[in-house]
């Protein structure tokens, strides 16, 4: 008989799906004549649906539509909203450099078209997700205006009960591909001065089209791979090559004292070893005398809807 002991960590308080760079286009065209971006996203959503995962929120970190077309946003909404509703998950949309602020607002958010930065606060119980728009209309690099940084500092002045996740498109980290410097987030130090010493526990980003991790002013940064196509990191040094492979998304588990980011690759694979069902796993854990403590948010509790707060309206030239 084993002595009963608690696992080293309880169940997570929050579970998020982090999806990025869907790059949908209007009609039935292939992205850059090569990739069926709709199909890749559909495959991933079906894979996630079959998994039994039940996230609290799904965070899309930008480049939702390749050309900012209304038809692309309508298509994305048609694919994602039923999926999120079935999972009982809230949707969090982030602007990317390929997106159009006015069209995204109109066709994804049912808001009046506006070219002001799309910054907002999303509260899921005690977890705060801050969406920060790093896009520059007409360009592909990233910038954050002084007015945006002021708004961000004001929001972060009051800590959230369970901390803050910052979601943006351009990651404030180096890229291992030289060409990325032409489209990187500029003046990252200014953002760092605002974030340092706050309750931001993790930064979620996209843009790079490959999965990577780093830290920024001591805060973990997780970049999700794209769902449409990815960058080949084995390309000759200094070069760049997009490829139809290695797509995926990230799973984010938020615990009281840590945030865990895990890559979910698109597609399955042959089973290796013996498949263990959830029921079998529970029995084996119990037989080992181990129990996993529940999270502070009971999984059966019906959580209140996510509360959205937009930043104050600003002039497009602010």
From Swiss-Prot:
Entry cofactors: Fe(3+); Mn(2+)
Residue span of region C-terminal extension: 278-318
Matches recorded under InterPro entries: Calcineurin-like_PHP_ApaH, CNP_phosphodiesterase-III, GpdQ/CpdA-like, Metallo-depent_PP-like
Positions annotated to bind Mn(2+): 63, 97, 169, 207
Phenotype upon changing residue 229 to A: 40% decrease in bis(pNPP) hydrolysis. 80% decrease in 3',5'-cAMP and 2',3'-cAMP hydrolysis
UniProt EC number: 3.1.4.16, 3.1.4.17
Sorted UniProt keywords: cAMP, Cell membrane, Cell wall, cGMP, Cytoplasm, Hydrolase, Iron, Manganese, Membrane, Metal-binding, Nucleotide-binding, Phosphoprotein, Secreted
Reported modifications of this chain: Phosphorylated on Thr-309 by the eukaryotic-type serine/threonine-protein kinases PknA, PknB and PknL. Phosphorylation does not affect the enzymatic activity, but it renders negative charge to the protein, promoting its localization on cell wall.
Domain of life from the UniProt record: Bacteria
Record comment: activity regulation: Ca(2+) acts as an activator of the enzymatic activity and is able to promote the hydrolysis of substrates even in the absence of transition-metal ions, thus providing an effective strategy for the regulation of the enzymatic activity. Two Ca(2+) ions bind at a site different from the dinuclear transition-metal-ion binding site. Activity is enhanced by magnesium or manganese. Activity decreases in the presence of orthovanadate and phosphotyrosine.
UniProt effect for mutating residue 98 to N: 2-fold increase in bis(pNPP) hydrolysis. 4-fold decrease in pNPP hydrolysis. 5-fold decrease in 2',3'-cAMP hydrolysis
Binding-site positions, AMP: 23, 63, 97-98, 209
Top-level EC class as recorded in UniProt: hydrolase
Gene Ontology CC entries for this record: cell envelope; cytoplasm; extracellular region; peptidoglycan-based cell wall; plasma membrane
Localisation: Cytoplasm; Cell membrane; Secreted, Cell wall; Cell envelope
UniProt-annotated binding residues for Fe cation: 21, 23, 63, 209
Mutagenesis / variant outcome for changing residue 23 to A: 50% decrease in bis(pNPP) hydrolysis. Does not affect cAMP hydrolysis. Strong decrease in interaction with the cell wall
Effect of residue 309 to D/E: Does not affect localization to the cell wall
Effect of residue 169 to A: 50% decrease in bis(pNPP) hydrolysis. Does not affect cAMP hydrolysis. Decreases interaction with the cell wall
Subunit structure comment from the entry: Homodimer.
Protein role: Cyclic nucleotide phosphodiesterase with a dual-specificity for the second messengers cAMP and cGMP. Can use 2',3'-cAMP, 2',3'-cGMP, 3',5'-cAMP, 3',5'-cGMP and 3',5'-cUMP. Hydrolysis of 2',3'-cAMP produces a mixture of 3'-AMP (major product) and 2'-AMP (minor product). In vitro, is 150-fold more active in hydrolyzing 2',3'-cAMP than 3',5'-cAMP. Can also hydrolyze the model substrates p-nitrophenyl phosphate (pNPP), bis-(p-nitrophenyl phosphate) (bis(pNPP)) and p-nitrophenyl phenylphosphonate (pNPPP). Overexpression elicits a transcriptional response that is independent of the phosphodiesterase activity. It does not alter the levels of cAMP-CRP regulated genes, even though cAMP levels are reduced in cells.
Domain notes: The C-terminal extension (CTE) is used to better adjust the substrates into the active sites and mediates in vivo subcellular localization of the protein. It also modulates expression levels of Rv0805 in mycobacteria.
UniProt similarity note: Belongs to the cyclic nucleotide phosphodiesterase class-III family.
Protein name listed in UniProt: cAMP/cGMP dual specificity phosphodiesterase Rv0805
Lineage of the species this protein comes from: Bacteria, Bacillati, Actinomycetota, Actinomycetes, Mycobacteriales
């Amino acid at each position: 008989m084993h002595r009963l002991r608690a696992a080293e960590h309880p169940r997570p308080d929050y579970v998020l799906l982090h999806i990025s760079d869907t790059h949908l286009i209007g009609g039935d065209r292939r992205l850059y004549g090569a990739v069926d971006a709709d199909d890749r996203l559909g495959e991933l959503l079906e894979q996630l649906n079959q998994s039994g995962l039940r996230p609290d929120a799904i965070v899309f970190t930008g480049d939702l539509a390749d050309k900012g077309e209304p038809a692309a946003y309508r298509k994305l909404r048609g694919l994602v909203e039923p999926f999120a509703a079935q999972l009982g998950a809230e949707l969090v949309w982030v602007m990317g450099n390929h997106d159009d602020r006015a069209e995204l607002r109109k066709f994804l958010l049912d808001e009046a078209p506006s070219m002001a930065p799309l910054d907002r606060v999303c509260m899921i119980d005690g977890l705060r997700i801050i969406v920060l728009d790093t896009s520059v209309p007409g360009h592909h690099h990233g910038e954050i205006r002084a007015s945006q940084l002021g708004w961000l500092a004001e929001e972060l002045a009051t800590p959230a009960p369970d901390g803050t996740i910052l979601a943006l498109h351009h990651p404030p980290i180096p890229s291992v591909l030289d060409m990325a410097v032409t489209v990187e987030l500029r003046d990252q130090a200014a953002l760092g001065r605002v974030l340092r010493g706050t309750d931001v526990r993790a930064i979620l980003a996209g843009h790079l089209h490959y999965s990577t991790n780093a830290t920024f002013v001591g805060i973990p940064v997780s970049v999700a791979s794209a769902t449409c196509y990815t960058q080949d990191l084995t390309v000759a040094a200094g070069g760049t090559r997009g490829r139809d492979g290695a797509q995926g998304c990230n799973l984010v588990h938020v615990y009281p004292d840590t945030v865990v980011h895990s890559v979910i690759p698109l597609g399955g694979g042959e089973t290796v070893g013996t498949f263990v069902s959830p029921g079998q796993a529970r029995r084996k854990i119990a037989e080992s005398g181990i129990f996993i403590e529940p999270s502070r948010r009971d999984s059966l509790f019906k959580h209140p809807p996510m509360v959205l707060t937009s930043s104050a309206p600003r002039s497009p030239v602010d």
